[in-house]
């Protein structure tokens, strides 16, 4: 049998200390020869940094750990592996603890074993440290040699550490975020009272913080919680209160702002309650002399000096003073109410007059604005998609523009736009556009009927390719006569001005706005013909 054989069987027949010494020395020399110059056992960080009493490697090996690298005591991977003279391998701390606790014998075969007979198995240590293990952190799929595990764990982004505030295990990469945003024991400052508390009691603090904003349940007024009780007891106009005469028998309850009206409406009833109360007090007071007539002189003197009798008289005087005070207050309140009613009527008349003046000023402003257009008016039809949806649903859409003048002085006109429904005869899904004359400020200064050229256009807001139609007025039509009502019911224009399909295909609608332009030139303008634009024959109004 060769002494340098590293298999367990090489130690089965060893029975003397001298044989052990020579064999152990030879094996130690051979094992050291297997280690590279940079892989001396003393330089392996995983084993050298471990406490001497630590058990084996409790890690997940991939592939699973072979039984020859498993400590028979802790059943984990051999840590700081040592060998016994009988050829068994143990963790250094495990076998030493076993010898101290259970006696000087090998736990496997019960052979006599002393601590000084143990020697490091550097060959097994190197093999174990070269095995592949998985990171034990949840969510991490990294694999590495066992010797690299400690370094990886110190850098693993899935590594966890206990929160110093709540002791919850948290990934190290999220620890700062946890301490500042999620930890239930993090310190918070109340924005209302500037007090400090842990987040776990935040809800309780918010419910009882005296400086927190709250809302009165009666009037919905915002105020701090510390003022809420006083507000409800003295100031809140909608808080329920008892009648001032509740001590005299009135059982009515109402809101504080209705108390004055109740006091005014039920004055007689309150006086009746007061009279009944005083009568009962007077009767109770009068029964005392009749009862005193049957008493001896000494008893009558004692009765006269009775504190109850004095107290009743004092209460009666106080009640009479209260009645006089309330009657005076009632008279003053009646006078104030009458004055307030007169003042209120005056203010109502003033408000009505101011509203009338406001309407007149608004009308004058619109009239002045209309006179500034000088016959060229651009009408912004906003929210046009809404009108299109109603048109598609079969609802007739009729829109009128604000009025405008052809000059100063000039004719007052407005535009009328129809979105014809899909079921309309001969003009379905068309835009119809007409011009109407209106009663204006300068009608008496103008010649009638209106004569001239009218140019209508729907503006292309993207490419500038506007849809334009030009028409001449016809003096014999009612549409151009001087209107006898605010707006001439007869219009002049085109029933089929523009198809809605063409409207959608081009840039006529931008930001949900359609622009319609009208240019009116009283008296015929020959320049239109010189520009090559021939008037299109108008169509009768519908």
Curated annotation (Swiss-Prot):
Q: Which InterPro entries match?
A: MATH/TRAF_dom, TNF_rcpt-assoc_TRAF_met, TRAF-like, TRAF1-6_MATH_dom, TRAF6_MATH, TRAF6_RING-HC, Znf_C3HC4_RING-type, Znf_RING
Q: Where is this region: Disordered?
A: 32-54
The question of whether Manganese is a record keyword is answered with no
> Locate the MATH domain: which residues?
374-520
Q: Which residues form a coiled coil?
A: 311-373
Extract one GO molecular function annotation from the record. Answer: ubiquitin protein ligase activity
Q: Give the binding site residues for substrate.
A: 489-496
Query: Where would you say this protein principally sits, based on its record?
Result: cytoplasm
Read off the Pfam families from this record. TRAF-mep_MATH, zf-C3HC4, zf-TRAF
Gene3D superfamilies hit by this protein:
Apoptosis, Tumor Necrosis Factor Receptor Associated Protein 2, Chain A, Zinc/RING finger domain, C3HC4 (zinc finger)
Q: Which PROSITE patterns match?
A: MATH (PS50144), ZF_RING_1 (PS00518), ZF_RING_2 (PS50089), ZF_TRAF (PS50145)
Q: Which GO terms describe its biological process?
A: innate immune response; lipopolysaccharide-mediated signaling pathway; non-canonical NF-kappaB signal transduction; positive regulation of DNA-templated transcription; protein K63-linked ubiquitination; regulation of apoptotic process; regulation of canonical NF-kappaB signal transduction; response to bacterium
Q: List residue spans of TRAF-type Zn fingers.
A: 151-203, 204-260
Q: How does it assemble?
A: Homotrimer. Homooligomer.
Instruction: Tell me, in a sentence or two, what this protein's role is.
Output: E3 ubiquitin ligase that, together with UBE2N and UBE2V1, mediates the synthesis of 'Lys-63'-linked-polyubiquitin chains conjugated to proteins, such as IKBKG, IRAK1, AKT1 and AKT2. Also mediates ubiquitination of free/unanchored polyubiquitin chain that leads to MAP3K7 activation.
PANTHER family named among the record's database cross-references: TNF RECEPTOR ASSOCIATED FACTOR, TNF RECEPTOR-ASSOCIATED FACTOR 6
Tell me the domain comment.
The coiled coil domain mediates homo- and hetero-oligomerization. The MATH/TRAF domain binds to receptor cytoplasmic domains.
Protein's name according to its UniProt entry: TNF receptor-associated factor 6
Origin organism is: Danio rerio
